[in-house]
Amino acid sequence: MKLIYVFLLILAVRLASVFVVQTYYVPDEYWQSLEVAHKLTFGYGYLTWEWVQGIRSYVYPLLIAGLYKILALLQLDSAHLLVVLPRIVQALLSAYSDYRFFVWTGKRKWALFLILVPWFWFYTGSRTLANTLEASLTTIALSYFPWYGESTAYLWPAAICCFLRPTAAVIWLPLSLYHLRRSRQNVLELILKRFVLIGLLVAGLGIAIDTYWHGQLIVTPYEFLKYNIFNNIGSFYGSHPWHWYFSVGLPTVLGINTLPFIFGVMETVKKSEKYPVSKQLLITIFLTLVVLSAVEHKEFRFVSPLLPLCLYVITDALSRWSIRASSTMLWTTALVILVGNVMPAWYLSTVHQKGPIELMPKLREIAREYRDEREHQANILFLMPCHSTPYYSHIHQNVTMRFLTCEPNLEKKEQYKDEADRFFEDPVHWINSHIPMHPLTALPTHVVLFDPLAENISVFLRNYRLLHRIEHAEVTRLEGSQALVDQWSEALGAQSPNLASLLQNRQSRTGRSILVYQRLKKGEENAFNRGPDSGQHEPDVHDHPPLEDLVLANENENLFN
């Protein structure tokens, strides 16, 4: 097959993922890229604490901001294009990295098959995540790595990787040592003229960009390591056991490909002289997992740069096995791998956690068209776990919005709880303490929440009508910060009988549906928790006292000031 046809096939799959993948994965896809770019370009948006503290580099958001600026100049900056175009560009980069993987592996058929079918790469390959960019750059760098020559071209994408994601150095340190050990060039000269020079150029440019946009001299890779590694801030968002990457993380990312990967590991260990590249890749994979395992906070996406390394090991082993395997075995193996990847790719890309993505066009319409009695625009309150949805980048209207924040304990206060934790501990108290009642027009015009919360704040919602119910997930999971682990420990240590209710409280943070409520205007019928076609009985307005009669802890505090 001609290389151009190979690239076009890969490109078609990656571009298809842009439009097939319509589910929510992690907040960083929006809050650390699109949201930042939107604020840079259009002057409004939300910057999370990471940008205030300077632990994120502006390099990636600036690339997206460049796209936004072009769209704005052409007067094509519709919300739809602001969402789709960055994903298309990321898909193009992912497609090129996949093509380079095919070339790197010797243009083997198994390589093309294995780079196209992984469920996790289909699921994340077009998302605007720094981890996706890192995985693409890692693959490109590996394809230029001097496995059998003296090229140092790989140092450029590798250096960019390490600047944007300092943890990438864990991958490139053993590979760089391997390069230096095998090189026939003078080692000191190679280090000074290539490694140090390229590193300084990339770091210098990155520091200059970040210093300008952060407004002060700053080295974001150092700040990243200081907060996430040395201060262990990441553990606030969840901790996992040391073996998680080995027992859960990498096997989940590989999915059904774990089976041929194990086969590849066994073949490489038994016949390491036949698999010199796979041997070095396995050493790199193992060392990377060991180092990452030392950090308490772990996520699937953190091992996505290891995916091309694992796929190479699989390709190497299956290509040699294919020489002696029967045609039936070959087709059966390929079919099992294909089906085993298509199923999770389809479910996670189209069904699970689709609510936030389907929600945003509805909020966009509200932001564009809604006006209250005083002709004021919408103001929207998200009573959900923090960053449960995209934000201004998907609405592209400068309306007032508010969500529950979840900054970590940067000041190391005792008994610290973020705003989201405080809200879900006692939603009614939080509402009474933070939302003004007089006049009723001071209430948020719209409230967005997951369905289990509605019953807990039913009195508050009597001033609203149900506008939209959006299906979110067939299966919900526990949400929350490190406080969940702390509460588990306390409950178990005290042999508390309330563990079940404690977990139920956490479970109620998310739900199967997302509900959008709209504030009642004067003279409108009070139809609490009832959709247009729901058929639910309307509660008697005398069952509860009017909300304006409730006593507030802080009546004068305005949520949207």
Swiss-Prot record:
Membrane disposition: Multi-pass membrane protein
Gene Ontology annotations for the cellular component aspect, listed alphabetically: endoplasmic reticulum membrane
Keyword Membrane in record: yes
GO BP term, pick one: GPI anchor biosynthetic process
Name of the top EC class for this enzyme: transferase
Pathway of action: Glycolipid biosynthesis; glycosylphosphatidylinositol-anchor biosynthesis
Chain segments carrying region Disordered: 525-546
Signal peptide (residue range): none
Keyword annotations from UniProtKB, A to Z: Endoplasmic reticulum, Glycoprotein, Glycosyltransferase, GPI-anchor biosynthesis, Membrane, Transferase, Transmembrane, Transmembrane helix
Gene Ontology terms, MF aspect: alpha-1,2-mannosyltransferase activity
Pfam families per UniProt: Glyco_transf_22 (PF03901)
Enzyme Commission (EC) number: 2.4.1.-
Intracellular or extracellular location(s): Endoplasmic reticulum membrane
InterPro entries: GPI_mannosylTrfase (IPR005599)
Transmembrane segments: 3-25, 64-84, 110-130, 155-175, 195-215, 246-266, 275-295, 328-348
Bias kind Basic and acidic residues: ranges: 535-546
Taxonomy, superkingdom: Eukaryota
Family: Belongs to the glycosyltransferase 22 family. PIGB subfamily.
Family annotation (PANTHER family): GLYCOSYLTRANSFERASE, GPI MANNOSYLTRANSFERASE 3
Protein name from the UniProt record: GPI mannosyltransferase 3
